[in-house]
């Protein structure tokens, strides 16, 4: 990305602008494929047009001054003729560098004269074209009474130019006197030469002072010129901004008040609709928050119910284990009873009857506890089912229904298992009672038989 403060122009636009500035040498072919001779000639014309300085004339003035000097200076100058072309290029390079630096390009070098690059040449010429446009626009703005600062600037510039011309005239006069004194040096009158030499030295000192004053004034003039150009550029930017603000205000002033009021009413209505929609969304958000909290509470209660059911299931397993132990004990008692019958010990029959009665009481208590737990679980399930039906959202109902169905199926399975265990237990008790009855009958018969035998 270029860091220049001016736009890079297209070649047709660039050529048109340069030809409008009387640079007829600038053609599309020459700009696209620049040669050293083309750029040197074109840059000389540009420097002569915009700075009023001709590099060739500067070198010619220097040569004329040396040719009119003494013999030693003439010999040095003759030796330097060998490098005359090089001096011309170096002088042009120095002047071009200063000129392009003033218009915003700081990387001009001597290779841009010897071996010009098409892109760099286009960039330099774009800077010249933009500078020419800026000068033309600035002169149009400064023309007449439209810009008082511009008028003062032109008057001050004319004044400085007049002073500069006067000082150049004085400088030329002093040069002519020096030349005359050099001619006097060729005479044989030693005293006249010494007097003329002193006068010449005095004039030279005065000339040096005038030259220094001229240099200081010229530098001051350049600084003043640069300051005025900066002020002019700033005023141009301010003018553009003010024109833009004026166009905006004019647009607003031409707008119909009824249209503005209608737009305000439409915007107010739109604002009210947006506020109503916002309130609805906030209410929906609150409802969702309440539903979410209810769902969390229901989920927590469901977890607690599952824990209770799990505890009940563990109790059922424990009771089942107790029943199995009781069954095992009954079977063991049956075996012991058979052993007692075979051994003829009647005392243990009474103990067996007591154990049987104790097991019946435990079985009755177990049935009562089981019925109480079943009633409590049924009431809890009914309450949970009612709460799920009334409070939970339809999506959550499906989830909870699956949980409740699973729990109900589990409880039903356990109830069925408990009923089966109870039936088995009742059957075993009946079987034991029948066996006990048969045993009593056998014992009675046995005792009767023994009594008959003893009697």
Swiss-Prot record:
Primary location recorded for the protein, binned into one broad class: nucleus
Top-level taxon of the source organism: Eukaryota
Pfam family, one: Nuf2
GO molecular function, one term: protein-containing complex binding
Subcellular location: Nucleus; Chromosome, Centromere, Kinetochore
Annotated family: Belongs to the NUF2 family.
PANTHER family: KINETOCHORE PROTEIN NUF2, MEMBRALIN/KINETOCHORE PROTEIN NUF2
Keywords recorded for this protein, A-Z: Cell cycle, Cell division, Centromere, Chromosome, Coiled coil, Kinetochore, Mitosis, Nucleus
Entry function: Acts as a component of the essential kinetochore-associated NDC80 complex, which is required for chromosome segregation and spindle checkpoint activity.
GO cellular component labels: Ndc80 complex; nucleus; spindle microtubule; spindle pole body
Subunit structure, interactors included: Component of the NDC80 complex, which consists of NDC80, NUF2, SPC24 and SPC25.
UniProt record, GO biological process: attachment of mitotic spindle microtubules to kinetochore; cell division; kinetochore organization; meiotic chromosome segregation; mitotic spindle organization
Coiled-coil regions, chain positions: 184-298, 343-380
Entry protein name: Probable kinetochore protein NUF2
InterPro entries cross-referenced by the UniProt entry: Kinetochore_Nuf2_N, Nuf2_N_sf
